[in-house]
Amino acid sequence: ACVHYPVYEQNEVDEKILSLEEVIEITHSKNKPVSVDAAGQIYPLENFGKYVKMGADFQCIAAKYMGAPHSTGIALGTKDVIDTIARHSFVGYESRRIRGIGRPHKIDRQEIIGVYAAVKRWMSLNHEERLSYEESKTLNIVNDIKDIEGLEVKIIDNIIGHQPFGLNIDIDSKKIKSNNLDFVDVLKNSEPSIWTRVPDGKDTIEIHVFGMTLDQSKIVGKVIKEKLEGLMI
């Protein structure tokens, strides 16, 4: 058994939730390990191994956010934990006396090479240029729709983690014949289809540009503008 702790450094701190330091202290006092879900904490680079240095026994990072295959990730932790994880291996499964655990969930050699290449590239990447590129995609959308009457547009200025920049939009139903939830469906049924959402606990439509090209961001801005202008009261 262990205590699993998710980390979202880009979010505001919830004072009602125990801090990672407190969780580590309490859990270790009971001689149990702490694992940290740091899936999207790929930037700043100091986050690699940060939570283990804080005292956690293990942290996992999703490699897909760095360009590796979708099903892959990397593990950072104490020697005991990493040695245990290594037993989840399919190498020599048919012939070893101690067979690997989790064979149905294996990843193949090509994916492992993909993770290595993605992490190596990520560590040497010019992140200022990367963030500037993400901001440019955001501005492509914002500039198309910012002057539409009845629409409030706010840029997401976060640069931490795997989804830098993006925008939130809020529809005034008194001026536009739609609302945020309905407009999500309008975009989903548009051509091309654009998938957005109103996240749980929030009221506005959230649009992230992670994974888009510059040209695709221009298309998104154009479609949103056309759909909104067609719904003006």
Give the predicted meaning of each segment.
Residues 57-59, 127, 180-181, 195:
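Short secondary-structure boundary micro-motifs
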Residues 138, 210-211, 230-231:
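Short amphipathic alpha-helical patches
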Residues 102, 106, 110, 114, ...:
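C-terminal alpha-helical cap/extension of soluble enzyme domains
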Residues 91-94, 187-194, 225-232:
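A common structural junction motif
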Residues 144-223:
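Conserved C-terminal alpha-helix-loop-beta "cap" of PLP-dependent enzymes
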Residues 1-122, 142-146, 154, 177, ...:
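Conserved PLP-enzyme active-site core in the AAT-like
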Residues 123-157:
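Conserved PLP-dependent catalytic core of the aminotransferase class-I/II
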